[in-house]
Regions:
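Vicinal oxygen chelate
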Residues: 1-6, 37-40, 59-85, 108
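Structured loop/turn residues at beta-strand edges in well-structured enzyme cores
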Residues: 44, 67, 117
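Hydrophobic, ordered structural segments
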Residues: 73-80, 88-94, 99-102, 114-127
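Amphipathic N-proximal alpha-helical interface segments
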Residues: 51, 55, 122-125
Length: 129
């Protein structure tokens, strides 16, 4: 789950202090214009996203909607095959080609109009993650 935030320090404190999540990774993803944090929860993660500028996709989201749930992500073994299958099924891809995400993963987004109103991210984790 990706959560757009305005103050990443306060968000980390909220999740660590109240929901027993642990900071797993933090980096700036310049290509997406965000500071991203992964918090461990069970076998998955919550991803916190702070926009680096107001004209980035997450910055525009926060300006329009305020902080909150941004997207749901699903890990796959082969993002290229998954995107091909999804496109063939008629779903609308925001990204026809994967781009680099957190921890050098390969990511692509599907448009909410074809996924029940939910911005959906497909993630092929880099080796070892």
């Amino acid at each position: 789950v990706g959560v757009a935030v305005e103050d990443i320090g306060a968000a980390i404190a909220l999740y660590e202090g109240n929901f027993e999540m642990a900071l797993a990774h933090r980096e700036t993803v310049e290509s997406q214009g965000v500071e991203a944090v992964l918090l461990d929860v069970g076998e998955g993660h919550v991803e916190l996203l702070r926009p680096l500028a107001p004209d980035t996709p997450v910055g525009k989201f926060v300006a329009k909607n305020g902080p909150g749930l941004h997207h749901v992500a699903y890990a796959v073994d082969d993002i290229d095959a998954t995107l091909e299958r999804i496109a063939a099924a008629g779903l609308t891809l925001i990204d026809r080609e994967p781009r680099v995400g957190i921890r050098d993963s390969r990511v692509a987004f599907l448009h909410p109009r074809s996924t029940g109103g939910v911005l959906t991210e497909i993630v092929e984790p880099a080796g070892g993650h």
